[in-house]
């Protein structure tokens, strides 16, 4: 039935011969999950086990609560509601860094500051950061359960820190990426007013304000008059509307990082024209 796709997938816990032979075809079937034998021998016990499994799955799908999982830390519904906004923020930070850090990394350092350090469980947030960062990698079947293991397989050590050091924001999530001892990328986020209003507010130590979703034209540029007008005219020429703009500079006349939030992806002609101009560097489109 599995081979013919009449049954899409199945999970089994009782077998005619236990333990099952090492070369049994069930062990490698892509649509079959083998679970521990529950040992419910009576009809009543089997019915109650089935009900309990259904309740656990329902709770996870409806509220995010994780109960009795053998490969994921326990997460009750109340804690899930607390960490859920941070999970979205963390995944966005990971996605952003995956698109702006041009090299492989071997260490990810995640700092929980302000009220974030008081969260009862930060593991789901760390997993979300890794999910975002590894989403563009050629990784099959990436999910919250295996993402830590896959990060380790790729040579990425994960460090978490609850910090009580003073920070600018009441709630602070900061991700730093390293290659050896060199920091190759960093991004930080917070919430403006409430968990329903998250923002990315740091990129490579530059203060910015970026929403978690959308298409963004990013580049470094010389800080001089006319840059915003020039880019705006260029985008308008190609019918690309600007939804928002955030920029940061080191000092007047120095270097700047500009982020244009656009309603549609700029065509290649826009990117090529900017790249030909020595005023601009690191021109890229980022999607969150």
Model-derived regions, located:
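Rossmann-like dinucleotide-binding domain for NAD(H)/NADP(H)
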Residues: 1-100, 118
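A conserved regulatory-domain signal marking ACT and ACT-like small-molecule sensing domains
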Residues: 74-288
């Amino acid at each position: 039935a599995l081979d013919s796709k009449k049954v899409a997938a199945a999970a089994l816990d009782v077998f005619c011969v236990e333990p099952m032979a090492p070369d049994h075809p069930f062990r490698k079937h892509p649509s079959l999950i083998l679970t521990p034998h529950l040992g419910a021998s009576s009809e009543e016990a089997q019915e109650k086990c089935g009900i309990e499994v259904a309740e656990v799955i329902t709770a996870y799908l409806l509220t995010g609560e994780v109960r009795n999982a053998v490969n994921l830390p326990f997460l009750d519904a109340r804690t899930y509601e607390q960490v859920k906004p941070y999970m979205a923020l963390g995944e966005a930070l990971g996605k952003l860094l995956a698109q702006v850090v041009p090299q492989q990394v071997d260490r990810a350092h995640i700092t929980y500051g302000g009220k974030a350090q008081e969260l009862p469980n930060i593991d789901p947030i760390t997993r979300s950061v890794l999910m975002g960062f590894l989403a563009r990698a050629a990784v099959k079947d990436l999910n919250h359960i295996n993402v830590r293991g896959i990060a380790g397989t790729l040579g990425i050590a994960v460090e978490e820190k609850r910090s009580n050091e003073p920070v600018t924001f009441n709630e602070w999530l900061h991700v730093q990426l390293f290659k050896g001892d060199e920091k190759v990328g960093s991004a930080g986020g917070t919430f403006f007013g409430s968990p329903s209003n998250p923002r990315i507010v740091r990129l490579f130590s530059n203060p910015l304000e970026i929403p978690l979703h959308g298409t963004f034209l990013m580049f470094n540029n010389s800080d001089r008059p006319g840059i915003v007008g020039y880019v705006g005219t260029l985008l308008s020429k190609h019918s690309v509307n600007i939804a928002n703009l955030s920029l940061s500079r080191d000092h007047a006349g120095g270097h700047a990082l500009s982020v244009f939030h656009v309603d549609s992806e700029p065509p290649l002609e826009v990117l090529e024209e900017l790249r030909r101009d020595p005023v601009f560097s690191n021109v890229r489109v980022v999607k969150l």
